Amino acid sequence: VIVAGYSFGADVALSVTDSRISRWITVAPVLSIFTEFAAAHDARPKTLIAAAHDQFRPAAELSSAVEAWRNTDVVVVEGADHFFHGAQRAIVDAIGAVLA
């Protein structure tokens, strides 16, 4: 099982742990719904796709926030904002690279 989510749904996805989960893939996580994210301490892989110019949690800020998380990669989509208008292909490519 791969757990995925976008924006606040990404926050919910990162709050879930279960033995059936193989990895997490999130797009534009805001990291503001909860004070603690269960996935942060989990050794299974996490990929957080971030917009460089996200209005709610810019990529640089997100990278700092998850620096201590286990087995976590942040993929930055340059030129994109929280809604990834015109940058959807970059999301598809990032997810494809993770799943390849």
Residue ranges and their predicted role:
Residues A4-A13:
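Gly/Ala-rich beta-loop-alpha elbow adjacent to hydrolase catalytic centers
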Residues Y6, I25-T35, A51-H53:
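Active-site nucleophile loop of the alpha/beta-hydrolase fold
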Residues V12-V16, T35:
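Hydrolases whose catalytic domains are alpha/beta-hydrolase-1, hotdog thioesterase
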Residues D42-A43, T47-A50, D54:
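Short beta-strand/loop motif that positions the catalytic acidic residue
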Residues A52-R57, H82-F83:
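Acidic catalytic loop of the alpha/beta-hydrolase fold
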Residues R57-E67:
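Short alpha-helix in the alpha/beta-hydrolase fold that links the catalytic acid
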Residues E67-F83:
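Catalytic histidine neighborhood in serine/cysteine hydrolases
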Residues H85-L99:
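Post-His helix in hydrolase/transferase enzymes
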